[in-house]
Curated annotation (Swiss-Prot):
It comes from Solanum lycopersicum. The keyword Cell division does not apply. It comes from the Eukaryota. Residues 211-431 are annotated as: N-terminal inhibitory domain NC. GO terms for molecular function: ATP binding; catalytic activity. This is ToMV susceptible protein tm-1(GCR26). One of its GO terms (biological process) is defense response to virus.
Length: 754
């Protein structure tokens, strides 16, 4: 897939090439032309990739001179059980559903691992359905456009709460004609403008707003309360986003919470819960409040408008409710008063959610009414029902330091109650409304700017290893700075003719004295623990323990005793129970400055290795892990066992390629089968040559097999070019321990007693 090799900002033009190839190509050409035109005055150069999402058996393998992703590559992202789907079912609806899920995964991966700058597609009703939910899964702010035949009338099912833009196609998307040319050209130009505009504005405004943003829910019957709350929050320095509690409003607010646009919530009007429980037309769903609680942001909750359920015109109210107390808000909206029994159900729903919270929550309850209609002389005034609601919540909620329940002798629309809401919120939120808060969609661009600042600090670092800004969209400046300093030191050593020496460590004492000996790099991985327990290194590839958990345990032992030398983590990239992006962040936070791919499937061969590759547990996962780590600014030093693997790792951005010659042969538990020392020279050279064809600046080290002593390392280094040193694991700690302890004990045993 061509896009995998490019880390520059990139847009995807997506459609079904089997039925709309000409239209997709025309759109892609105009997107590229507009991007090039707009980019003349921009520092960003944006690439275009065409993505085929066809579900027929007709294969398309290219589209003019564009980078192209065939449908089979998108389909490979669809996981079902333990395998993948190799072909689509004959039923069109099922095929579209599968491709939709595959595309969603494909875009999610692209957004996480590349600089995805935007997506644009075209289609009829089926194509729009296929594209829209996948597009909606991307963060708000990333341009997302569909030219569609159904871009009119009821479009909520396509757009949801996202910022997806639908362009009416006017005519059917069936060939290029005078009308479709105009529509596709304009849509392509508008999309290109969104992309460049976002990239440029993000350079200047990467922090979305200096103000802490608060989401507030409102209904017409709680407007006085919300207006007073909003006015007070603005005076306190906060920005407010008000959402009409219509079902869609609550979902929109929680989507913005997930995206990082909202940092606190005053959920004053929770009436959507009533519609959900009873069956109204403005209902939330079962996930209401989940995003707020998962993000652990300040939440103040009240019971606004929980005295009513919403329906359309009076004639649409279900027959079983026709005898209930109904208030006709207008010709299109009818409100039904809730009962004591229903209020108990609302309280149970809310309490069940909030009792699971692991962050601070405050529930504020007004005793004298929950809406403008719940007041003396108004249609829904019912002190018994209101009292039941508030008392039920007090009884069900776990009132403790984490969850506070406060009851006030006010009506919800009294200014005193509004002030009490804000006071409770201020107790939980930052003292100042001014904070640095990034949205999900702006983080990658902010990362590039931070990287730029670091790289400007090191102007002498002008090789490929240092200067490609777009390689580091997810890098923290401090992480990237460590990487650059380490690589610069290594480059300085190489320029002075000194070898780079890396070492594996399985214990704190090994690492401590490797550093004392002057080693340049230390790598921790599970086989080090097994080696120092008297077992062979291959134990680290067998199901004896959790390899990644062992590395985290070893960090506590090793990192405190190593003072200056870079310490890297050996990562089992094929681990099916860890999300690699999250695990790498965990390693970074612990204190590791880089990673290596170990345990590695490279040590397997034959049918077993082939089966691993065929079942999605192959070396490619290790390449992906290294690429992800590289984008985070971590130092990457992967093992490669052949030239092809070296090429893949170099293209992934690896800083140091370690040419692995197999299990070390020396010592009491070393291997007996390996290449000869002479053969290893040829193998190491081939790996070095392949690496340098991709990245001439990459560092190459030799390792393993017959290379188990300083003499053997010197033999290889003197007979190769472009190989800069040696990395030892068994040879650095197991063999010295075997030899030193054996010799020391023998010396003691040789003491004469005469």
């Amino acid at each position: 897939m061509a896009t995998a090799q490019s880390n520059s900002p990139r847009v995807f033009c997506i459609g079904t090439a089997d039925t709309k190839f000409d239209e997709l190509r025309f759109l892609s050409e105009h997107v590229r032309s507009s991007l090039n035109s707009f980019s003349n005055k921009s520092s960003f150069k944006v690439g275009v990739t065409v993505v085929d999402v066809s579900t027929s058996r007709k294969e398309t393998n290219s589209c003019a001179d564009f980078d192209f992703v065939p449908s089979k590559d998108v389909l490979s992202c669809y996981a079902r059980g333990e395998g993948t789907v190799g072909r689509f079912p004959d039923i069109r609806g099922q095929a579209i559903a599968i491709m939709n899920k595959a595309l969603e995964t494909f875009l999610s991966k692209a957004n996480g691992e590349q600089n995805l700058a935007g997506v644009i597609g075209l289609g009829g009703s089926g194509g729009t359905s296929l594209l829209s939910s996948a597009f909606r899964s991307l963060p708000i702010g990333i341009p997302k456009v569909i030219i569609s035949t159904v871009a009119s009338g009821q479009t909520e099912s396509y757009i949801g709460t996202s910022d997806l833009v639908l362009f009416p196609s006017v005519v059917d998307i069936c060939g290029i004609n005078n009308v479709s040319k105009v529509v596709l050209s304009n849509a392509g130009a508008a999309f290109a403008g969104m992309v460049i505009g976002r990239l440029e504005s993000s350079k200047e405004h990467s922090i979305t707003n200096g103000k802490f943003t608060v989401g507030v829910t409102m209904f017409g019957v709680t407007t006085p309360c919300v207006n007073a709350v909003k006015e007070r929050l603005v005076k306190e320095g906060y920005e407010t986003l008000v959402f009409h509690a219509t079902g869609v409003g609550g979902r929109a607010m929680e989507d913005l919470v997930r995206g990082g646009f909202i940092q606190g919530v005053l959920d004053i009007t929770t009436t959507e819960v009533a519609d959900y429980v009873v069956g109204g037309v403005m209902a939330c769903d079962s996930s209401r409040f989940d995003a707020i609680l998962e993000k652990k942001i300040p939440l103040v909750l009240s019971v606004g408008a929980l005295d009513m359920v919403n329906f359309g015109p009076k004639t649409t109210i279900p027959p079983e409710f026709q005898q209930r107390k109904i208030h006709q808000h207008n010709e299109q909206v009818s409100l039904m008063h809730t009962t004591v029994g229903e209020n108990k159900k609302f309280a149970a729903f809310i309490a069940e959610k909030l009792n699971k919270a692991s962050s601070s929550v405050c529930v504020c309850l007004p005793e004298k009414g929950v809406s403008a209609l719940d007041a003396p002389g108004k249609d829904f005034y019912d002190p018994e029902a209101t009292s039941c609601l508030t008392h039920e919540l007090q009884m069900l909620l776990e009132n403790n330091e984490r969850c506070q329940v406060k009851v006030y002798p006010y009506h919800i629309n009294d200014v005193e109650f509004a002030n009490a809401l804000v006071d409770s919120f201020l107790e939980m939120s930052p003292k100042s409304g001014h904070v640095e808060c990034q949205t999900a969609e702006s983080k990658s661009i902010q990362g590039i700017q931070n990287v730029n600042a670091v790289l400007e600090k090191y102007p002498s670092c002008n090789g490929k290893n240092f200067s490609r800004l777009n390689d580091f969209p997810n890098a923290k400046p401090e992480t990237l700075q460590k990487r650059i300093v380490i690589l610069q030191k290594l480059k300085d050593q190489i320029s002075k003719g000194k070898p780079i020496i890396g070492a594996g460590a399985g214990t704190g004492i090994s690492a401590k004295f490797e550093e004392a000996g002057g080693v340049d790099l230390i790598v921790l991985y599970n086989s080090g623990r097994f080696r120092m327990a008297g077992r062979g290194s291959l134990a680290g590839l067998l199901p004896f323990a959790d390899a990644n958990a062992i590395v985290l345990e070893m960090a506590n032992e090793v990192l405190p005793v190593v003072k200056e030398v870079a310490v890297l983590a050996g990562v089992c990239a094929t681990d099916p129970f860890r999300r690699m992006d999250n695990f790498l962040k965990q390693l970074e936070s612990v204190g590791f400055c880089g990673v290596q791919n170990f345990p590695t499937v490279g040590l397997f061969d034959g049918n077993f290795r082939q089966n691993l590759e065929e079942t999605g547990m192959g070396y490619g996962l290790e390449v992906e892990m290294i690429a992800t780590a590289h984008r985070m600014g971590l130092l990457t030093t992967p093992y490669a066992f052949c030239p092809d693997e070296a090429v893949a790792m170099a293209e992934a951005g690896a800083d140091i390629i370690v040419a692995h010659m197999g299990l070390t042969t020396s010592g009491s538990i070393g291997a007996k089968t390996a290449v000869s020392l002479e053969e290893s020279v040829t193998c190491v050279q081939a790996i070095a040559d392949a690496t340098h064809r991709i990245n001439p600046d990459a560092i190459v080290l030799c390792h393993g097999g017959p290379i188990s002593s300083p003499e053997e390392a010197a033999y290889v280094l003197k007979r190769t070019t472009g190989v800069h040193g040696f990395y030892g694991a068994s040879s650095m700690e197991r063999l010295p321990v075997e030899q030193a302890i054996t010799a020391t004990v023998q010396q003691y045993k040789s003491i004469s007693m005469e």
